[in-house]
């Protein structure tokens, strides 16, 4: 029997989560109810951010977003664990970009390395 599973993350900010998903080319919807894929008999789940009718993120009691999806009917070509890693990396990128901007800096250059690390060069005129 199929059911919605959750995968915990350390993601805490909704705006950066949405930006990260959009950078990864996902169509993002807010405040949606996930539906039972293939008419499986499990309860509907309300999520804060969704990227389809059966995949989303909801805020848990620890103030962190968790991925909610029916893993048995996962359609994305990227496996769930790798998907969370990619979203987390883009979330970190957006968080750093937003903090840099708040501090008055500007990103001059950005590189994604072969090992998937990201390097930035930032400047600020004083």
Where are these regions (language model features)?
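Interaction-mediating elements
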Residues: 1-126
């Amino acid at each position: 029997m199929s059911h919605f599973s959750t995968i915990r993350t350390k993601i805490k900010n909704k705006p950066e989560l949405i930006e990260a998903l959009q950078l990864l080319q996902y169509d993002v919807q807010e405040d949606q109810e996930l539906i039972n894929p293939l008419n499986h008999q499990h309860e509907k789940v309300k999520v804060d951010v969704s990227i389809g009718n059966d995949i989303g993120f909801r805020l848990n009691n620890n103030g962190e977003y968790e991925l909610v999806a029916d893993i048995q009917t996962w359609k994305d070509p990227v496996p769930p664990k790798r998907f969370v890693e990619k979203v987390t990396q883009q979330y970190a990128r957006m968080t750093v970009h937003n903090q840099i901007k708040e501090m008055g800096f500007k990103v001059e250059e950005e590189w994604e390395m072969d090992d998937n690390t990201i390097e930035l060069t930032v400047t600020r005129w004083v």
